[in-house]
Amino acid sequence: MRELLEKIAAEGEVVADGVLKVDRFLNHQVDPHLMKRIGEEFAAQFHRERPTKVLTLESSGISPALMAAYELGVPLVVARKRRPLTMTSEVYCAEVYSFTKKETNEIIVSRPLLDSSDRVLIIDDFLANGQAALGMVEVVRQAGADVVGIGIVIEKAFQDGGRLLRSQGFRVVSLARIASLSDGVIRFHEEVMS
């Protein structure tokens, strides 16, 4: 997605080898026009799979996932990292390791929000080692539902997550693929989605 690539090139910042800071438009301050375009692109890519729900992990995946759900006309389910007092029902849960925070979290989804009839599209802001996506896949499987695709805003193609998910048969659509983040330079993968 050319608009996203241009935004990353202009406003993204390499803060360490393998770490890309995009807090000016994606995960701290959010560019609503860009999120709308991202939602439209994910909807265009996945509408044939007829998802009934979009699933993301709090908190940085919420903006692009909400716009995708809006464009698809389906509910958004947000997997939580902590169980709030208001979550009184039984839950689906899985452990997820965060590459950025270097910690393991348990993610949870209230059971009434997913069931075996659901066709779930997973959306997330980043794909690095694939652990967040695999945790969400596990939650969907616990519900007996189907994962119909995985949409990623920014994939770190130099890490194993994309290969891991694709090797398991998942259709993964990444709107921007980063080839490397070394020496303070953002290098994009040659494949560019319009």
Swiss-Prot record:
Residues making up the signal peptide according to the UniProt record: none
GO annotation (BP), single: xanthine metabolic process
Gene3D superfamilies attached to this UniProt entry: 3.40.50.2020
Entry keyword annotation includes Protein biosynthesis: no
Keyword Glycosyltransferase (UniProt): yes
SS bond partners: none
Pfam families recorded: Pribosyltran
Cross-referenced CDD domains: PRTases_typeI
Superkingdom of origin organism: Bacteria
UniProt keyword terms in alphabetical order: Cytoplasm, Glycosyltransferase, Purine salvage, Transferase
GO CC, any one term: cytoplasm
Chain sites annotated for binding xanthine: 20, 27, 156
Chain sites annotated for binding 5-phospho-alpha-D-ribose 1-diphosphate: 128-132
Catalysed reaction equations from the record: XMP + diphosphate = xanthine + 5-phospho-alpha-D-ribose 1-diphosphate
EC number: 2.4.2.22
SUPFAM superfamilies xref list: PRTase-like
Localisation: Cytoplasm
Pathway assignment: Purine metabolism; XMP biosynthesis via salvage pathway; XMP from xanthine: step 1/1
Protein family per UniProt: Belongs to the purine/pyrimidine phosphoribosyltransferase family. Xpt subfamily.
Role played: Converts the preformed base xanthine, a product of nucleic acid breakdown, to xanthosine 5'-monophosphate (XMP), so it can be reused for RNA or DNA synthesis.
Subunit structure: Homodimer.
Name of the protein in its database record: Xanthine phosphoribosyltransferase
